A protein has these predicted regions:
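N-terminal nicking endonuclease/strand-transfer module with a His-rich metal-binding environment
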Residues: 1-229
Length: 229
């Protein structure tokens, strides 16, 4: 079953998004893992592409857009939106899902649902706690850099006009869940009804708080297991 989760970030360091996706980080603290010389270690495997960035990096494309439209100058402004599509671990064995295929699906999903936004699309081969599920990260700059053709899921001019910001509303999340289900159906991948799913819209701070809480629970369970309880 594929799922989609959303995180928003107010971090003005746009380069941090690509750094997180390409370098190894502690899955609980979010801190980079360093080698013996104190340098960040690259991830063992990933695929990464950018969209709507021209010849610039993702970070530079976002900064240029902010300057052009006079947006995202405040500390409380949402700078990026991060969507994570996680596929069923069984898809790799049962349905031939590869990183390359997942990356292609993620790129098309981004083009279809976040047109006009600078974006990073990055596929990783494994999830938290070695879950074995291929997953795709889609990080978009919150500001749209060009006017796009209106799509059925866009209900206000700010959803397609240049210089406007992405809105992750309940209606948008519902649309994205349906889009994920349709994507998996067309690709012959395992899927469940995501319209019954809950809890897929959290802030970056809430996300890491949940991860830290899970770590404490894992330690407690390990201690009980060691004591034979």
């Amino acid at each position: 079953m594929a799922t989609i989760k959303h995180l928003s970030s107010k971090n003005s360091n746009y380069a941090a998004a690509e750094s997180y996706l390409t370098f190894q980080h502690n899955e609980y603290t979010g801190l980079p893992i360093l080698d013996e010389k104190g340098r960040p270690k690259l991830r063992d495997s990933y695929l990464l592409d950018t969209l709507e960035c021209s010849e610039s990096s993702f970070a530079m494309a976002c900064l240029i857009a902010n300057r052009k439209y006079g947006k995202n100058g405040g500390r409380e402004d949402v700078k990026t939106h991060h969507y994570i599509i996680s596929f069923d671990p069984k898809d790799a064995v049962e349905n031939g899902l590869t990183m390359e295929r997942a990356q292609a699906l993620g790129l098309q999903f981004c083009k279809d649902n976040f047109p006009g936004h600078p974006a990073i699309v990055c596929t990783h081969p494994d999830g938290h706690n070695s879950a074995g599920n291929i997953h795709v990260h889609i990080v978009i700059g919150s500001l749209r850099v060009r006017t796009v053709e209106r799509q059925p899921f866009m209900d206000k001019p700010c959803d397609w006009e240049a210089g406007k910001k992405h809105r992750c509303t309940s209606a948008m999340l519902r649309h994205l869940r349906v889009a994920v289900m349709e994507m998996c159906e067309q690709a012959d991948l395992n899927q469940i009804n995501l319209l019954e799913a809950q809890g897929d819209h959290v802030s970056e701070r809430e996300y890491w708080a949940q991860r830290h809480g899970q770590r404490r629970l894992d330690h407690a369970n390990a201690k009980l297991a060691a004591e034979g309880q």
